[in-house]
Amino acid sequence: MNLHEYQGKQLFAEYGLPVSKGYAVDTPEEAAEACDKIGGSEWVVKAQVHAGGRGKAGGVKLVRSKEDAKAFAQQWLGKRLVTYQTDANGQPVTKILVESCTDIAKELYLGAVVDRSSRRIVFMASTEGGVDIEKIAHDTPEKILKATIDPLVGAQPFQGRELAFQLGLEGKQVAQFAKIFVGLAKLFQDHDLALLEVNPLVIKADGDLHCLDAKINIDANAMYRQPKLKTFHDPSQDDPREAHAAKFELNYVALEGNIGCMVNGAGLAMGTMDIVNLHGGKPANFLDVGGGATKERVTEAFKIILSDTNVAAVLVNIFGGIVRCDMIAEGIIGAVKEVGVKIPVVVRLEGNNAELGAKVLAESGLNIIAATSLTDAAQQVVKAAEGK
């Protein structure tokens, strides 16, 4: 689950980290009032969406009057912001963050992720702040500094000082960086985060360090023990199809192709998408119906896939283990009848009662194409999507 910038900074403040004074507002009038509360003559106004690249898309602006702050809120509230990280529809803007202005001397980067290879939290820092860190890591990996956190003792101040020296910090900045480093590590562990970024972490004109941005992603599998963070969830930022799928315990991710995929098992689903790509097709989604692929879940899966108007054909790839393939076949037939599927459906069944499942499909009288193998299924669905 992602957090908005203002929510991330709220957590930063709770851990004693330096953040700008700001208010998240819902109306243009509140934006003007926030300027009065903050004081000063310049403010930064930011559209709050779960996506990067807001500045280049016009979603971040420096304003010098309350009227300009109000106008910015009027421009964006209720609208959708399209950035390089969103799809063509963009993300809806329901809040604007109004902040005090920061005099920036230099921009740094500081972030943390769970490194699956070492099974540790790993911090990354760079002198190249305020830019796309993935590009820096790819083009100039030597500019990315790392510190691995021992889960038994946690982040240590000396690790923060080592990173600070490597970043070229000096004087009071070293102690400030170590405090931020340890605070972020505690925040990461306390709240079961999957990713944390401060980009940029800035050196102000007076030499102090300041967290100018906050990007936080929480491990969805740990939400049951983070009741406070559950209240931070903003459903407006969710893909409607993904949110609907979650209600039925379906793992769905929308993509930009035209071949709908319905598979049981995440690994098999990824393999299915790969082989569709290999044969020239483009998957419209990732959809894992899980081990309990009942008729009801298969029906909902079809509804979700077909809600994407780009879908020209559907590939159903089921491996029957505990779940019998003949039962899955009956579920597919029932779902196709109930939903009224008008596009080609290619089905590949393998495993428990696969032959019986294929027979059930063949005797259904429906326009369902039975595939003999995964390769055959991919070739058939690509042809069907192309109208061949």
UniProtKB/Swiss-Prot annotation:
Question: What does it do?
Answer: Succinyl-CoA synthetase functions in the citric acid cycle (TCA), coupling the hydrolysis of succinyl-CoA to the synthesis of either ATP or GTP and thus represents the only step of substrate-level phosphorylation in the TCA. The beta subunit provides nucleotide specificity of the enzyme and binds the substrate succinate, while the binding sites for coenzyme A and phosphate are found in the alpha subunit.
Task: Write down how the cofactor binds this protein.
Answer: Binds 1 Mg(2+) ion per subunit.
Q: Which family does it belong to?
A: Belongs to the succinate/malate CoA ligase beta subunit family.
Q: What is catalyzed by this enzyme?
A: succinate + ATP + CoA = succinyl-CoA + ADP + phosphate; GTP + succinate + CoA = succinyl-CoA + GDP + phosphate
What is the source species?
Pseudomonas fluorescens (strain ATCC BAA-477 / NRRL B-23932 / Pf-5)
Gene Ontology terms: biological process: succinyl-CoA metabolic process; tricarboxylic acid cycle
Q: What is this protein called?
A: Succinate--CoA ligase [ADP-forming] subunit beta
State its cofactor: Mg(2+)
